[in-house]
């Protein structure tokens, strides 16, 4: 990623990365790394693909990618592994809404990123 794109990416997501609750994702294991590292990678890849393909609404899509797994394992202790697949997007959305005003696109991306486990198709 070029320095200009890195700067642009940082401007889009910095407020999320500075959030103390979001930083706690460092302590959550996810796919062999921390959940923080996972969502950071996903959002950087998303940003890069949006740039390559000249996708509109890049800021919203990138931010939703960063927030898509903003949940904690303690939130899902009562559920089995299969249930967690469809429930965790809603927990991520609930947590994101505590700190950020999200539009319909961002909400849709977060809640439906596990389609078809979430049963509803993505709207966008």
How should these model regions be labeled?
Residues 1-124:
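Metal-dependent phosphohydrolase cores
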């Amino acid at each position: 990623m070029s320095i200009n794109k890195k700067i642009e990416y940082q401007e889009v997501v910095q407020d999320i990365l500075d959030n103390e609750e979001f930083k706690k994702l460092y302590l959550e294991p996810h796919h062999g790394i921390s959940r923080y590292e996972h969502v950071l990678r996903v959002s950087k890849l998303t940003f890069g693909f949006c740039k390559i393909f000249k996708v509109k609404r890049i800021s919203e899509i990138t931010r939703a990618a960063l927030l898509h797994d903003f949940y904690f394992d303690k939130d899902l202790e009562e559920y089995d592994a299969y249930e967690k697949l469809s429930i965790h997007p809603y927990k991520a959305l609930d947590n994101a809404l505590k700190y950020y005003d999200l539009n319909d696109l961002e909400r849709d991306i977060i809640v439906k990123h596990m389609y078809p486990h979430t049963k509803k198709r993505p709207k966008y």
